[in-house]
Each structure stands twice: as C-alpha cells, then as structure tokens.
C-alpha cells in the first residue's frame, strides 16, 4: 500500500484497454522519419478498405452447425484479417474491394471483423424487407 507522499510523487498508472478490433487501429505514417512505417493510433478507424485474398466457408463452434461465409481480407495498412460476410448470398470473390468494420462473430473463432454490405464491391442482400440498412438493401418499389 503506497503512502500519500508516494502517490503524490508517482501517481497511479492507467490500465491500457485492449482493443477488440486491433487491425483498424494501425495506420501508415505519411511524413517524418517514420514515413512508410505502421503506427498505432489511439482511436483507430471505424472502417477500413481492403482486398479479398480468399473467400471460403467455415464451420462454427459446437453446438451450432452451418457453413458460414468468410473472406480473408488484406487491409490498406497491410494487415490481413478474417472477416464475416453477413446476409444470404454474396457476390464476393478474390480481388473484390470491400469495406471492413469491427464486430466479432461469436461462434467463429478468430473472426473479429464484418464486411459492410452495400459498400464498394459488396452488393446488398437481394429481396430483403426488414433490417435493410444493415445489409445495404435499397427500399423496394411499391
């Protein structure tokens, strides 16, 4: 237990909070002697652009059973991540340019990111009536 004098002199050290989407926190330095090097920024980015390296399926943990669609994406900062493709059906293939956001998939180990539907090369989900904004679907004509 520190004395009051020790606390006045040193103070308490803040606990560093671990990011749930670390790949979105790295950016390339553009200027200075660290130009071209990766550096970590405290807030990071809400989304990042990337290119699909591989598109495949994955089986979830017990007790679930399915073939979940995932893509391996190389982000603009050079980091490669595994991202989930939400919704029914997709048009993604190798070399597709996608927008990646944070957000894990609970039953897929190692999948901490989602692909944003309706942005860049990822088309919105066809014939979706409810929750359209999450799947990049336009309002249907009456």
From Swiss-Prot:
Gene3D superfamilies per record: Nucleic acid-binding proteins (2.40.50.140)
Alphabetized GO MF terms: rRNA binding; structural constituent of ribosome; tRNA binding
Region (Disordered): 1-21
Keywords, in A-Z order: Methylation, Ribonucleoprotein, Ribosomal protein, RNA-binding, rRNA-binding, tRNA-binding
InterPro entries: NA-bd_OB-fold (IPR012340), Ribosomal_uS12 (IPR006032), Ribosomal_uS12_bac (IPR005679)
Composition bias type Basic residues, residue spans: 9-20
Positions of post-translational 3-methylthioaspartic acid modification: 107
GO CC terms in record: small ribosomal subunit
Record-linked HAMAP family: Ribosomal_uS12_B (MF_00403_B)
Family from the record: Belongs to the universal ribosomal protein uS12 family.
Function: With S4 and S5 plays an important role in translational accuracy.
Protein name: Small ribosomal subunit protein uS12
Gene behind the chain: rpsL
């Amino acid at each position: 237990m520190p004395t009051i004098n020790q606390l006045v002199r040193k103070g308490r050290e803040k606990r560093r909070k671990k990011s749930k989407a670390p790949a979105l926190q790295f950016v390339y330095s553009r200027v200075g002697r660290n130009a071209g090097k990766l550096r970590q920024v405290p807030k990071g980015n809400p989304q990042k652009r990337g290119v699909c390296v591989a598109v495949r399926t994955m089986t979830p943990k017990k007790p679930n059973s399915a073939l979940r669609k995932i893509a391996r994406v190389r982000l603009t900062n050079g980091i490669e991540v595994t991202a989930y493709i939400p919704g029914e059906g997709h048009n993604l293939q190798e070399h597709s340019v996608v927008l990646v956001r944070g957000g894990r998939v609970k039953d897929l180990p190692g999948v901490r990111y989602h692909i944003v539907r309706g942005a860049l090369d990822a088309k919105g989900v066809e014939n979706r009536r409810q929750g359209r904004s999450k799947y990049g679907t336009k309002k249907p004509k009456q």
